[in-house]
Protein backbone atom coordinates (compact mmCIF):
# COMPACT_ATOMS: atom_id res chain seq x y z
CA UNK A 1 0.00 0.00 0.00
CA UNK A 2 1.24 3.51 -0.83
CA UNK A 3 1.05 5.80 2.21
CA UNK A 4 0.59 9.53 1.69
CA UNK A 5 0.85 11.48 4.95
CA UNK A 6 0.79 14.93 3.36
CA UNK A 7 -2.14 16.73 4.98
CA UNK A 8 -1.76 20.07 3.20
CA UNK A 9 -5.28 19.89 1.76
CA UNK A 10 -6.95 17.15 3.76
CA UNK A 11 -6.53 18.65 7.23
CA UNK A 12 -7.38 22.28 6.34
CA UNK A 13 -10.44 21.20 4.34
CA UNK A 14 -11.66 18.91 7.14
CA UNK A 15 -11.18 21.56 9.85
CA UNK A 16 -12.73 24.42 7.88
CA UNK A 17 -15.71 22.44 6.60
CA UNK A 18 -16.51 21.17 10.07
CA UNK A 19 -16.18 24.62 11.64
CA UNK A 20 -18.30 26.33 8.98
CA UNK A 21 -21.00 23.69 9.48
CA UNK A 22 -20.84 24.21 13.25
CA UNK A 23 -21.16 27.98 12.88
CA UNK A 24 -24.26 27.55 10.74
CA UNK A 25 -25.84 25.07 13.17
CA UNK A 26 -25.06 27.26 16.18
CA UNK A 27 -26.59 30.23 14.41
CA UNK A 28 -29.82 28.34 13.80
CA UNK A 29 -30.20 26.35 17.01
CA UNK A 30 -28.14 27.66 19.95
CA UNK A 31 -29.20 30.42 22.35
CA UNK A 32 -28.32 31.36 25.93
CA UNK A 33 -30.22 29.81 28.79
CA UNK A 34 -31.95 32.23 31.17
CA UNK A 35 -29.02 32.31 33.61
CA UNK A 36 -26.79 33.72 30.84
CA UNK A 37 -29.41 35.93 29.19
CA UNK A 38 -29.94 39.68 29.82
CA UNK A 39 -33.47 38.78 30.91
CA UNK A 40 -31.90 37.32 34.08
CA UNK A 41 -32.56 40.73 35.68
CA UNK A 42 -36.29 40.22 35.18
CA UNK A 43 -36.01 36.59 36.25
CA UNK A 44 -34.57 37.68 39.60
CA UNK A 45 -37.59 39.90 40.19
CA UNK A 46 -40.02 37.12 39.26
CA UNK A 47 -38.27 34.64 41.58
CA UNK A 48 -37.81 37.26 44.30
CA UNK A 49 -34.02 36.89 44.28
CA UNK A 50 -32.03 39.70 45.86
CA UNK A 51 -28.59 38.66 44.64
CA UNK A 52 -26.87 37.21 41.58
CA UNK A 53 -25.37 34.47 43.74
CA UNK A 54 -28.37 32.28 42.86
CA UNK A 55 -27.20 32.29 39.25
CA UNK A 56 -26.01 28.83 38.19
CA UNK A 57 -22.63 30.29 37.24
CA UNK A 58 -21.59 30.64 40.87
CA UNK A 59 -22.50 27.02 41.65
CA UNK A 60 -20.96 25.37 38.63
CA UNK A 61 -18.03 27.46 37.39
CA UNK A 62 -15.36 26.18 39.84
CA UNK A 63 -16.19 22.59 38.87
CA UNK A 64 -16.33 23.51 35.19
CA UNK A 65 -12.88 25.07 35.39
CA UNK A 66 -11.42 21.96 37.02
CA UNK A 67 -13.02 19.62 34.47
CA UNK A 68 -11.81 21.84 31.62
CA UNK A 69 -8.24 21.63 32.92
CA UNK A 70 -8.53 17.85 33.15
CA UNK A 71 -9.62 17.54 29.52
CA UNK A 72 -7.05 19.84 27.95
CA UNK A 73 -4.08 19.58 30.33
CA UNK A 74 -4.61 16.34 32.23
CA UNK A 75 -5.46 14.01 29.37
CA UNK A 76 -3.13 15.85 26.99
CA UNK A 77 -0.02 15.55 29.13
CA UNK A 78 -0.86 12.06 30.39
CA UNK A 79 -0.24 10.83 26.84
CA UNK A 80 3.14 12.53 26.40
CA UNK A 81 5.01 9.48 27.69
CA UNK A 82 5.99 8.43 24.16
CA UNK A 83 9.51 9.70 23.52
CA UNK A 84 8.85 11.18 20.05
CA UNK A 85 5.11 11.86 20.16
CA UNK A 86 4.72 14.71 22.64
CA UNK A 87 3.62 17.32 20.10
CA UNK A 88 0.95 15.00 18.76
CA UNK A 89 -0.26 13.84 22.18
CA UNK A 90 -0.94 17.36 23.42
CA UNK A 91 -1.71 18.96 20.05
CA UNK A 92 -4.11 16.35 18.68
CA UNK A 93 -5.85 16.11 22.07
CA UNK A 94 -6.30 19.90 21.87
CA UNK A 95 -7.71 19.61 18.33
CA UNK A 96 -10.20 16.82 18.96
CA UNK A 97 -11.35 18.35 22.25
CA UNK A 98 -11.94 21.79 20.69
CA UNK A 99 -14.00 20.24 17.90
CA UNK A 100 -15.70 17.75 20.19
CA UNK A 101 -17.06 20.28 22.69
CA UNK A 102 -18.78 22.21 19.90
CA UNK A 103 -20.37 19.12 18.37
CA UNK A 104 -21.30 17.81 21.83
CA UNK A 105 -23.15 21.03 22.68
CA UNK A 106 -25.30 20.43 19.62
CA UNK A 107 -25.83 16.68 19.96
CA UNK A 108 -26.50 16.72 23.70
CA UNK A 109 -28.60 19.85 23.26
CA UNK A 110 -30.86 18.31 20.64
CA UNK A 111 -31.40 15.27 22.85
CA UNK A 112 -31.65 16.85 26.30
CA UNK A 113 -32.16 20.65 26.33
CA UNK A 114 -34.04 21.39 23.10
CA UNK A 115 -37.13 23.49 23.79
CA UNK A 116 -38.72 22.81 20.41
CA UNK A 117 -36.95 25.68 18.73
CA UNK A 118 -33.58 26.32 20.36
CA UNK A 119 -30.87 24.60 22.36
CA UNK A 120 -30.55 26.64 25.55
CA UNK A 121 -26.93 26.62 26.73
CA UNK A 122 -25.74 27.20 30.28
CA UNK A 123 -22.69 26.20 32.29
CA UNK A 124 -24.01 22.69 32.93
CA UNK A 125 -24.16 22.15 29.16
CA UNK A 126 -20.48 23.11 28.95
CA UNK A 127 -19.60 20.61 31.69
CA UNK A 128 -21.55 17.86 29.93
CA UNK A 129 -19.80 18.70 26.65
CA UNK A 130 -16.45 18.35 28.43
CA UNK A 131 -17.59 14.99 29.81
CA UNK A 132 -18.45 13.86 26.30
CA UNK A 133 -15.03 14.92 25.04
CA UNK A 134 -13.45 13.11 27.98
CA UNK A 135 -14.81 9.90 26.50
CA UNK A 136 -13.18 10.79 23.17
CA UNK A 137 -9.87 11.46 24.93
CA UNK A 138 -10.09 7.99 26.48
CA UNK A 139 -10.62 6.41 23.06
CA UNK A 140 -7.76 8.49 21.65
CA UNK A 141 -5.45 6.78 24.14
CA UNK A 142 -6.15 3.39 22.57
CA UNK A 143 -5.13 4.53 19.06
CA UNK A 144 -2.44 7.02 20.09
CA UNK A 145 0.41 7.20 17.61
CA UNK A 146 -1.33 5.16 14.91
CA UNK A 147 -3.86 7.55 13.38
CA UNK A 148 -3.76 10.87 11.54
CA UNK A 149 -5.42 14.08 12.78
CA UNK A 150 -8.02 13.73 10.01
CA UNK A 151 -8.90 10.27 11.30
CA UNK A 152 -9.20 11.71 14.80
CA UNK A 153 -11.66 14.36 13.61
CA UNK A 154 -13.76 11.69 11.91
CA UNK A 155 -13.61 9.48 15.00
CA UNK A 156 -14.62 12.41 17.22
CA UNK A 157 -17.57 13.25 14.96
CA UNK A 158 -18.99 9.74 15.24
CA UNK A 159 -18.06 9.07 18.85
CA UNK A 160 -19.66 12.26 20.15
CA UNK A 161 -22.83 11.31 18.28
CA UNK A 162 -22.86 7.80 19.73
CA UNK A 163 -21.93 9.04 23.20
CA UNK A 164 -24.84 11.49 23.20
CA UNK A 165 -27.31 8.79 22.16
CA UNK A 166 -25.94 6.36 24.74
CA UNK A 167 -26.05 9.02 27.45
CA UNK A 168 -29.65 9.86 26.57
CA UNK A 169 -30.67 6.20 26.78
CA UNK A 170 -28.99 5.71 30.16
CA UNK A 171 -29.86 8.98 31.90
CA UNK A 172 -33.25 9.78 30.38
CA UNK A 173 -34.80 6.43 29.48
CA UNK A 174 -33.26 4.03 32.00
CA UNK A 175 -32.75 6.86 34.53
CA UNK A 176 -29.52 5.41 35.91
CA UNK A 177 -27.23 7.24 38.32
CA UNK A 178 -23.80 7.88 36.82
CA UNK A 179 -22.60 11.29 38.00
CA UNK A 180 -18.91 10.53 37.40
CA UNK A 181 -19.46 8.63 34.18
CA UNK A 182 -18.02 5.19 34.97
CA UNK A 183 -20.41 3.75 32.37
CA UNK A 184 -21.15 6.64 30.01
CA UNK A 185 -17.65 8.14 29.84
CA UNK A 186 -15.03 5.59 30.83
CA UNK A 187 -16.43 2.18 29.91
CA UNK A 188 -17.97 3.50 26.70
CA UNK A 189 -14.87 5.46 25.69
CA UNK A 190 -12.46 2.65 26.51
CA UNK A 191 -14.26 -0.13 24.66
CA UNK A 192 -15.10 2.12 21.73
CA UNK A 193 -11.41 2.98 21.41
CA UNK A 194 -10.29 -0.62 21.87
CA UNK A 195 -12.71 -1.80 19.18
CA UNK A 196 -11.43 0.85 16.78
CA UNK A 197 -7.85 -0.21 17.62
CA UNK A 198 -8.79 -3.83 16.90
CA UNK A 199 -10.22 -2.94 13.49
CA UNK A 200 -7.14 -0.79 12.73
CA UNK A 201 -4.74 -3.57 13.75
CA UNK A 202 -1.25 -3.03 12.31
CA UNK A 203 0.57 -6.35 11.81
CA UNK A 204 3.95 -4.67 11.34
CA UNK A 205 3.76 -2.22 14.22
CA UNK A 206 6.87 -3.85 15.67
CA UNK A 207 8.81 -1.78 13.12
CA UNK A 208 8.01 1.26 15.29
CA UNK A 209 8.57 -0.56 18.58
CA UNK A 210 11.63 1.50 19.48
CA UNK A 211 9.57 4.71 19.48
CA UNK A 212 6.74 3.09 21.48
CA UNK A 213 8.64 3.68 24.68
CA UNK A 214 9.34 6.51 27.07
CA UNK A 215 12.37 8.46 28.23
CA UNK A 216 13.13 9.95 31.61
CA UNK A 217 11.83 13.38 30.61
CA UNK A 218 8.78 12.18 28.67
CA UNK A 219 7.66 10.22 31.74
CA UNK A 220 8.01 13.35 33.86
CA UNK A 221 5.78 15.27 31.43
CA UNK A 222 3.21 12.46 31.58
CA UNK A 223 3.31 12.60 35.37
CA UNK A 224 2.20 16.24 35.15
CA UNK A 225 -0.97 15.02 33.46
CA UNK A 226 -1.44 12.37 36.14
CA UNK A 227 -1.20 14.89 38.96
CA UNK A 228 -3.64 17.32 37.34
CA UNK A 229 -6.14 14.51 36.80
CA UNK A 230 -5.66 13.12 40.30
CA UNK A 231 -6.11 16.51 42.00
CA UNK A 232 -9.19 17.54 40.04
CA UNK A 233 -11.01 14.20 39.87
CA UNK A 234 -13.24 15.02 42.87
CA UNK A 235 -14.53 17.99 40.84
CA UNK A 236 -15.03 15.73 37.82
CA UNK A 237 -17.19 13.24 39.72
CA UNK A 238 -19.21 15.92 41.52
CA UNK A 239 -19.51 18.55 38.79
CA UNK A 240 -23.13 17.87 37.80
CA UNK A 241 -24.37 16.36 41.05
CA UNK A 242 -27.32 17.99 42.78
CA UNK A 243 -26.43 21.01 44.91
CA UNK A 244 -25.87 20.34 48.57
CA UNK A 245 -25.20 16.97 50.16
CA UNK A 246 -24.92 14.98 46.91
CA UNK A 247 -22.17 17.17 45.48
CA UNK A 248 -20.40 17.29 48.82
CA UNK A 249 -20.59 13.51 49.21
CA UNK A 250 -19.32 12.88 45.67
CA UNK A 251 -16.18 14.94 46.31
CA UNK A 252 -15.47 13.16 49.61
CA UNK A 253 -16.00 9.69 48.15
CA UNK A 254 -13.75 10.38 45.16
CA UNK A 255 -11.06 11.87 47.38
CA UNK A 256 -10.97 8.72 49.51
CA UNK A 257 -11.03 6.31 46.58
CA UNK A 258 -8.14 8.05 44.81
CA UNK A 259 -6.01 8.06 47.95
CA UNK A 260 -6.50 4.33 48.52
CA UNK A 261 -5.79 3.61 44.87
CA UNK A 262 -2.34 5.22 45.05
CA UNK A 263 -1.17 2.98 47.87
CA UNK A 264 -2.39 -0.25 46.28
CA UNK A 265 -0.97 0.70 42.88
CA UNK A 266 2.44 1.41 44.39
CA UNK A 267 2.30 -1.81 46.41
CA UNK A 268 1.41 -3.97 43.41
CA UNK A 269 3.92 -2.25 41.13
CA UNK A 270 6.74 -3.02 43.55
CA UNK A 271 5.52 -6.55 44.31
CA UNK A 272 5.32 -7.51 40.64
CA UNK A 273 8.91 -6.45 39.87
CA UNK A 274 11.51 -9.08 40.67
CA UNK A 275 13.74 -6.45 42.30
CA UNK A 276 10.88 -4.58 43.94
CA UNK A 277 11.22 -1.48 41.76
CA UNK A 278 8.35 0.79 40.72
CA UNK A 279 7.16 1.06 37.12
CA UNK A 280 6.32 4.61 36.06
CA UNK A 281 3.55 3.32 33.76
CA UNK A 282 1.69 2.01 36.81
CA UNK A 283 2.17 5.22 38.80
CA UNK A 284 1.02 7.38 35.89
CA UNK A 285 -2.12 5.38 35.19
CA UNK A 286 -3.24 2.86 37.80
CA UNK A 287 -3.22 5.52 40.53
CA UNK A 288 -6.15 7.19 38.74
CA UNK A 289 -8.33 4.08 38.48
CA UNK A 290 -10.01 4.80 41.81
CA UNK A 291 -11.59 7.93 40.37
CA UNK A 292 -12.92 5.97 37.41
CA UNK A 293 -14.31 3.12 39.49
CA UNK A 294 -16.10 5.43 41.90
CA UNK A 295 -17.79 7.49 39.16
CA UNK A 296 -21.18 5.79 39.15
CA UNK A 297 -21.58 5.69 42.93
CA UNK A 298 -19.86 9.01 43.68
CA UNK A 299 -22.97 10.73 45.04
CA UNK A 300 -24.51 7.60 46.59
CA UNK A 301 -24.16 6.39 50.18
CA UNK A 302 -21.17 4.09 49.82
CA UNK A 303 -19.64 5.67 52.95
CA UNK A 304 -15.93 6.62 53.12
CA UNK A 305 -14.78 3.08 53.89
CA UNK A 306 -16.69 1.83 50.83
CA UNK A 307 -14.90 4.42 48.72
CA UNK A 308 -11.57 3.18 50.08
CA UNK A 309 -12.52 -0.38 49.14
CA UNK A 310 -13.39 0.63 45.57
CA UNK A 311 -10.09 2.49 45.23
CA UNK A 312 -8.24 -0.48 46.73
CA UNK A 313 -9.78 -2.93 44.25
CA UNK A 314 -9.34 -0.65 41.23
CA UNK A 315 -5.66 -0.06 42.04
CA UNK A 316 -5.01 -3.80 42.18
CA UNK A 317 -6.96 -4.67 39.04
CA UNK A 318 -5.52 -1.80 37.01
CA UNK A 319 -1.90 -2.60 37.90
CA UNK A 320 -2.39 -6.30 37.17
CA UNK A 321 -3.94 -5.33 33.85
CA UNK A 322 -0.88 -3.37 32.77
CA UNK A 323 1.40 -6.28 33.67
CA UNK A 324 -0.59 -9.20 32.27
CA UNK A 325 -3.66 -8.15 30.31
CA UNK A 326 -2.22 -5.58 27.88
CA UNK A 327 0.38 -8.02 26.45
CA UNK A 328 -2.34 -10.69 26.18
CA UNK A 329 -4.69 -8.38 24.27
CA UNK A 330 -1.98 -7.52 21.77
CA UNK A 331 -0.58 -11.01 21.24
CA UNK A 332 -3.84 -12.99 21.28
CA UNK A 333 -6.64 -10.60 20.30
CA UNK A 334 -4.62 -8.19 18.12
CA UNK A 335 -5.73 -5.17 20.15
CA UNK A 336 -2.85 -2.68 20.24
CA UNK A 337 -3.76 -0.50 23.23
CA UNK A 338 -1.11 2.23 23.26
CA UNK A 339 -2.01 3.87 26.59
CA UNK A 340 -3.54 0.88 28.33
CA UNK A 341 -7.00 2.45 28.47
CA UNK A 342 -8.47 -0.99 29.14
CA UNK A 343 -6.72 -1.02 32.51
CA UNK A 344 -7.31 2.60 33.51
CA UNK A 345 -10.80 3.19 32.09
CA UNK A 346 -12.30 -0.06 30.79
CA UNK A 347 -12.11 -2.48 33.71
CA UNK A 348 -12.50 0.20 36.42
CA UNK A 349 -15.49 1.53 34.45
CA UNK A 350 -17.09 -1.92 34.60
CA UNK A 351 -16.28 -2.14 38.32
CA UNK A 352 -17.97 1.22 38.76
CA UNK A 353 -21.05 0.03 36.88
CA UNK A 354 -21.29 -3.09 39.02
CA UNK A 355 -20.78 -1.06 42.20
CA UNK A 356 -23.59 1.23 41.08
CA UNK A 357 -25.99 -1.67 40.58
CA UNK A 358 -25.17 -3.15 43.99
CA UNK A 359 -25.29 0.18 45.83
CA UNK A 360 -28.62 1.14 44.26
CA UNK A 361 -30.19 -2.23 45.03
CA UNK A 362 -29.42 -1.99 48.76
CA UNK A 363 -30.52 1.64 49.17
CA UNK A 364 -33.09 2.10 51.94
CA UNK A 365 -34.86 4.73 54.00
CA UNK A 366 -32.69 4.03 57.06
CA UNK A 367 -29.60 4.98 55.07
CA UNK A 368 -30.95 7.96 53.12
CA UNK A 369 -34.11 9.03 54.92
CA UNK A 370 -37.43 9.14 53.09
CA UNK A 371 -36.89 12.54 51.48
CA UNK A 372 -33.20 11.85 50.93
CA UNK A 373 -33.93 8.60 49.09
CA UNK A 374 -36.43 10.30 46.80
CA UNK A 375 -34.00 13.14 46.13
CA UNK A 376 -30.96 10.91 45.57
CA UNK A 377 -32.67 8.74 42.95
CA UNK A 378 -35.04 11.34 41.51
CA UNK A 379 -38.13 9.42 42.59
CA UNK A 380 -41.33 11.20 41.61
CA UNK A 381 -44.75 10.49 43.05
CA UNK A 382 -45.74 8.95 39.73
CA UNK A 383 -43.11 6.22 40.23
CA UNK A 384 -45.25 4.21 42.58
CA UNK A 385 -43.64 0.94 41.49
CA UNK A 386 -40.05 2.11 42.05
CA UNK A 387 -37.87 -0.03 44.28
CA UNK A 388 -34.14 -0.27 45.01
CA UNK A 389 -34.00 -3.67 43.30
CA UNK A 390 -35.56 -2.20 40.17
CA UNK A 391 -33.05 0.67 40.22
CA UNK A 392 -30.24 -1.85 40.56
CA UNK A 393 -31.48 -3.76 37.51
CA UNK A 394 -31.65 -0.54 35.51
CA UNK A 395 -28.09 0.28 36.58
CA UNK A 396 -26.90 -3.13 35.35
CA UNK A 397 -28.83 -2.69 32.11
CA UNK A 398 -27.15 0.69 31.62
CA UNK A 399 -23.72 -0.93 31.80
CA UNK A 400 -24.65 -3.51 29.16
CA UNK A 401 -26.12 -0.81 26.89
CA UNK A 402 -22.92 1.24 27.15
CA UNK A 403 -20.74 -1.74 26.27
CA UNK A 404 -22.96 -2.75 23.36
CA UNK A 405 -23.00 0.78 21.94
CA UNK A 406 -19.23 0.99 22.28
CA UNK A 407 -18.54 -2.33 20.56
CA UNK A 408 -20.99 -1.89 17.68
CA UNK A 409 -20.09 1.76 17.17
CA UNK A 410 -16.38 1.00 17.35
CA UNK A 411 -16.65 -1.60 14.58
CA UNK A 412 -18.52 0.79 12.28
CA UNK A 413 -16.17 3.71 12.89
CA UNK A 414 -13.10 1.48 12.67
CA UNK A 415 -14.15 0.27 9.23
CA UNK A 416 -14.57 3.88 8.08
CA UNK A 417 -11.14 4.82 9.45
CA UNK A 418 -9.49 1.91 7.62
CA UNK A 419 -10.06 3.67 4.30
CA UNK A 420 -6.62 4.54 2.88
CA UNK A 421 -7.07 8.25 2.13
CA UNK A 422 -7.09 9.75 5.65
CA UNK A 423 -3.34 10.42 5.69
CA UNK A 424 -2.36 7.73 8.18
CA UNK A 425 1.32 6.85 8.61
CA UNK A 426 2.85 3.50 7.59
CA UNK A 427 3.63 0.96 10.30
CA UNK A 428 7.31 1.88 10.41
CA UNK A 429 6.55 5.59 11.02
CA UNK A 430 4.05 5.33 13.87
CA UNK A 431 4.63 7.18 17.16
CA UNK A 432 6.63 9.86 15.34
CA UNK A 433 5.88 13.59 15.56
CA UNK A 434 7.90 14.42 12.45
CA UNK A 435 5.27 12.77 10.22
CA UNK A 436 2.76 15.57 10.91
CA UNK A 437 4.73 18.31 12.69
CA UNK A 438 7.55 20.68 11.84
CA UNK A 439 10.21 19.66 14.34
CA UNK A 440 12.96 22.11 15.36
CA UNK A 441 16.42 20.82 14.64
CA UNK A 442 18.39 19.68 17.64
CA UNK A 443 21.65 21.59 18.19
CA UNK A 444 24.72 19.60 17.25
CA UNK A 445 26.46 20.66 20.43
CA UNK A 446 25.22 21.51 23.89
CA UNK A 447 27.94 24.13 24.24
CA UNK A 448 26.83 27.66 25.13
CA UNK A 449 25.83 29.72 22.06
CA UNK A 450 25.35 33.47 22.02
CA UNK A 451 25.64 36.33 19.57
CA UNK A 452 27.45 38.28 22.31
CA UNK A 453 31.14 37.59 21.70
CA UNK A 454 31.91 38.50 25.29
CA UNK A 455 30.17 35.33 26.43
CA UNK A 456 32.37 32.36 25.66
CA UNK A 457 31.63 28.69 26.05
CA UNK A 458 33.28 26.96 29.00
CA UNK A 459 36.63 25.39 28.33
CA UNK A 460 36.70 21.61 28.22
From Swiss-Prot:
Keywords: Ammonia transport, Cell membrane, Glycoprotein, Membrane, Transmembrane, Transmembrane helix, Transport. The chain crosses the membrane at residues 10-30, 62-82, 90-110, 126-145, 152-174, 180-200, 220-240, 252-272, 286-303, 307-329, 347-367, 397-417. N-glycosylated. Residues 31-61, 111-125, 175-179, 241-251, 304-306, 368-396 are extracellular. One of its GO terms (biological process) is regulation of pH. It comes from Bos taurus. One of its GO terms (cellular component) is plasma membrane. It holds the Pfam family Ammonium_transp. This is Ammonium transporter Rh type C.
Amino acid sequence: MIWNTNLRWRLPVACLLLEVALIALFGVFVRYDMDADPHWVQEKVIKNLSTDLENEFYYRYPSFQDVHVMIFVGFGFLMTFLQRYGYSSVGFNFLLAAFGIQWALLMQGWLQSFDGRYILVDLENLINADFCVGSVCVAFGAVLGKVSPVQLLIMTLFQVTLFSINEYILLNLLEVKDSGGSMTIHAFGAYFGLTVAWILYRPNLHLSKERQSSTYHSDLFAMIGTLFLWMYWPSFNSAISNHGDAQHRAAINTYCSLAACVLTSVALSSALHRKGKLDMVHIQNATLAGGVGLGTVAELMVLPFGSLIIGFVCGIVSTLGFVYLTPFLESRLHIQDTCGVHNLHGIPGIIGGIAGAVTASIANIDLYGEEGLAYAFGIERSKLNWSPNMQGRFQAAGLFVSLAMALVGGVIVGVILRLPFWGQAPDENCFEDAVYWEIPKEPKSTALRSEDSSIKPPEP
